[in-house]
Regions:
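Hydrophobic/aromatic-rich core segments of domains that either
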Residues: 163-175
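Aromatic- and glycine-rich peptidoglycan recognition patches
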Residues: 36, 158, 186-226
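Short, basic/aromatic beta-hairpin or loop at an interaction surface
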Residues: 42-57, 135-151, 186
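Short beta-strand-centered aromatic/proline hotspots
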Residues: 19, 181-186
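Boundary regions of SH3-family modules and the immediately adjacent low-complexity/disordered segments
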Residues: 2-5, 12-14, 20-115
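Active-site loop architecture of trypsin-fold serine endopeptidases
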Residues: 122, 173-181, 194-201
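Catalytic cysteine-centered active-site loop
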Residues: 117-166
Length: 226
C-alpha cells in the first residue's frame, strides 16, 4: 500500500521479501515499487503523523507531479503535499475500539462495492476478503492482522447472528474447520464481503446466502465484535 513502511527480509534479483511495520506481514514486491527512506529512523516511524486517504485520491506535491493512490494509503504530513478526500491524521494504530465507528465502517464498505477480487490484494485496484476488512478497520484507526483466521482471534464473541450489529465481523470455515473467509456485518441479516468482487449478500445462522443463485456460499463459524 502506498506510504506504508517496511523492512527488507530477503532480496532476489529485482524482487524483495519485505515485512510491513503496520502488521508484520511478509510478501514479495518489485524493487521498482519502493523508495528508500534515509532521513528517518526506524524507531521514529510508528510515531510519525500520517494522513489517511478515504477514497481513491489524487495527491500532488510542490513540483506539480500527481499520483492516484488507493483508499487507505498513508501520506506523511507535509505542507508540500496537497490532496482531496483525506480522512484524518493517525499517529499510531493500536488494538483498541476507542476510535471505532460502526457507521464509518459500513459507509466505507459501501464505497468499495464492486471492487474486483484479487487474492493478496488490499487496495481499490483489487482486494481479498481479509484485505478488505483490514483496510476498513485501518481507516477507522484499528489495526487488525492480515489473515482472516488471525482476525478471528480478536474481539468478543457474539453468540447468535440475530445479536450481530453493524461493524461486527462474521467468520466462515471450510470443510476442514479452518477459517478461510471474513465479512463485515452491516445488520443482522446482511454482510459486505469480497467474493468475486466486493458485494452485499444475505446472512443467517447457516452462513452467507447468494440470492441470485439460491445457494449458500460460505458456512458461518463465529461472529466477533472488535
Amino acid at each position: 500500500m502506498y506510504g506504508e513502511s517496511f523492512e527488507v527480509v530477503d532480496f532476489q534479483n529485482s524482487w524483495m521479501m519485505v515485512r510491513t511495520v503496520f502488521d508484520d506481514y511478509e510478501g514479495w514486491i518489485s524493487t521498482g515499487q519502493l523508495h528508500e527512506v534515509l532521513d528517518i529512523s526506524q524507531e521514529k516511524l510508528p510515531s510519525e503523523k500520517r494522513i489517511l486517504c478515504s477514497s481513491l485520491t489524487n495527491i500532488s506535491n510542490i513540483l506539480n507531479h500527481s499520483l492516484w493512490v488507493s483508499f487507505g494509503s498513508e501520506i506523511q504530513e507535509s505542507d508540500k503535499i496537497s490532496a482531496s478526500n483525506l480522512v484524518k491524521i493517525v499517529p499510531s494504530f493500536k488494538f483498541s475500539s476507542n476510535q471505532l465507528s460502526a457507521k464509518q465502517l459500513v459507509d466505507n464498505a459501501q464505497l468499495l462495492l464492486g471492487t474486483p477480487y484479487l487474492w493478496g490484494g488490499r487496495s481499490v485496484f483489487g482486494m481479498d476478503c481479509s484485505g478488505f476488512v483490514q483496510l476498513l478497520f485501518k481507516a477507522a484507526g484499528i489495526a487488525l492482522p492480515r489473515d482472516a483466521y488471525k482476525q478471528a482471534e480478536k474481539g468478543v464473541t457474539i453468540d447468535f447472528i440475530e445479536e450481530a450489529q453493524a461493524g461486527d465481523l462474521a467468520f466462515f470455515d471450510n470443510d476442514e474447520g479452518k477459517i478461510n473467509h471474513v465479512a463485515l456485518v452491516i445488520d443482522s441479516k446482511n454482510v459486505i464481503h469480497a467474493s468475486g468482487y466486493v458485494r452485499k449478500d444475505a446472512i443467517d445462522h447457516h452462513g452467507i446466502f447468494n440470492q441470485a443463485t439460491g445457494k449458500y456460499t460460505h458456512k458461518l463459524r463465529i461472529i466477533k465484535r472488535i
